[in-house]
Design a protein with these regions (language model features):
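Cytosolic-side transmembrane-helix boundaries in multi-pass membrane proteins
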Residues: 1-2, 13, 185-192, 196-199, ...
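Membrane-interfacial amphipathic/re-entrant helices at transmembrane-helix boundaries
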Residues: 1-31, 59, 67-74, 99-105, ...
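Inter-helical junctions in multi-pass inner-membrane proteins, predominant
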Residues: 9-27, 170-175, 202-244, 264-280
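Single transmembrane alpha-helix segments in multi-pass membrane proteins
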Residues: 13-65, 88-103, 242-250, 292
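Helix-loop-helix "hairpin" substructures at the membrane interface of multi-pass membrane proteins
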Residues: 20, 24-25, 145-226, 249-255
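Alpha-helical transmembrane segments within multi-pass membrane transporters and channels
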Residues: 35, 68-112, 118, 255-259, ...
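Pore- or pathway-lining transmembrane helices of multi-pass membrane proteins that form conduits
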Residues: 52, 96-120, 230-242, 255-258, ...
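Transmembrane helix-bundle core of multi-pass membrane transporters
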Residues: 96, 104-173, 200-203, 268-278, ...
Length: 306
């Protein structure tokens, strides 16, 4: 008990971190849902998600420095992220369609490296200590108990829920959504039925790009406007998607919230040495989930004798 007490904060100390963790988890969920839908529709694990969002956020910051309207700048960030993602999908999607999953995922790392290089050339090399994105909603909020909750944090939670529910409804009740689900089950059969595969894939790439842009702007506000930091925050979203085995968007949402809260709990630890490991939380949780899933699969096979 003494060990646990020395590692984890008291409830009173943890409450502000809990709200922050839930807000971050909701944005991870938004990102994870985009990755799952794209993977189900195209078979591509989009590891450039974070880099695309970071690039859009930095462009938005640059526009605000040129006295653009702040909301228009953020809109440009989202549109730019969507265009980059769609362009990548349309140029390389067909070539990657028949390749192994590892090759598809690795190919997106090429886009990540290109964007990181561009961001370093355009922004990082000139110094970035004073760069920041501050949403107007940061200045508004309310007090819950003894915790200050910003409107931005509430919007993040709402966006995560709406994205998850809306995407689920889209996949289930719309023609395009059911086509995406059919492609996830059997791409070749879907193609033989006359389904316009390229159009469906374009919709998936476009939607994923929009979510990347939104996540990039919000995470730049919640965490930091730093190219490397934002690029690798995709790891938390990827972990949530892996916990859901790249299938269920609901499980992705729940897993992302858990990752956000666990990460916040570790970061709030009074033990400085322990708090330094908060970045490992997504890896550990994903590894545990995959081990449990694999164990269940082994038990099922042993029982059926298959």
């Amino acid at each position: 008990m003494l060990l646990v007490g020395s590692l984890f904060p008291s409830w009173q100390d943890f409450q502000p971190f809990l709200i922050t963790g839930l807000a971050l988890g909701a944005v991870y969920a938004l990102s994870g849902v985009g990755m799952v839908v794209l993977y189900r529709a195209t078979g591509v694990l989009y590891l450039a998600f974070g880099a695309v969002g970071a690039f859009g956020a930095l462009v938005a910051w640059q526009l605000t420095q040129s006295h653009w309207n702040i909301w228009l700048a953020y809109l440009v960030a989202v549109v730019l992220s969507a265009v980059i993602t769609l362009a990548y999908g349309m140029v390389f999607g067909s070539a990657l369609a028949a390749r192994e999953p590892v090759v598809k995922a690795t190919a997106t790392l090429g886009l990540t490296l290109i964007l990181l290089g561009a961001m370093d050339l355009l922004w990082t090399s000139s110094g970035g200590a004073s760069r920041a994105i501050l949403l107007p909603t940061d200045n508004h909020g309310f007090v819950l108990g003894q915790i200050n909750v910003t409107t931005t944090q509430v919007i993040c939670l709402a966006a995560g829920v709406v994205t998850t529910v809306g995407t689920g409804a889209f996949l289930r009740f719309t023609k395009l959504g059911t086509t995406m689900r059919a492609m996830a089950n059997d791409r070749e059969i879907t193609a033989t039925l006359g389904v316009p595969i390229r159009r469906v894939e374009a919709a998936a790439w476009l939607g994923c790009g929009v979510l990347a842009g939104l996540a990039g702007v919000v995470l730049a506000d919640l965490v930091a406007l730093d190219a490397t930091t934002l690029t690798f925050l995709v790891i938390s979203s990827l972990a949530a998607a892996l916990i859901a085995q790249l299938r269920s968007i609901v499980i992705t949402f729940i897993a992302a919230l858990v990752i956000g809260v666990v990460d916040a709990a570790i970061e709030a630890s009074p033990n400085q040495g322990f708090s330094n490991y908060h970045d490992m939380a997504p890896f550990v949780l994903a590894a545990i989930a995959l081990l449990v899933a694999n164990r269940k699969r082994v038990i099922s096979i042993s029982r059926t004798g298959i």
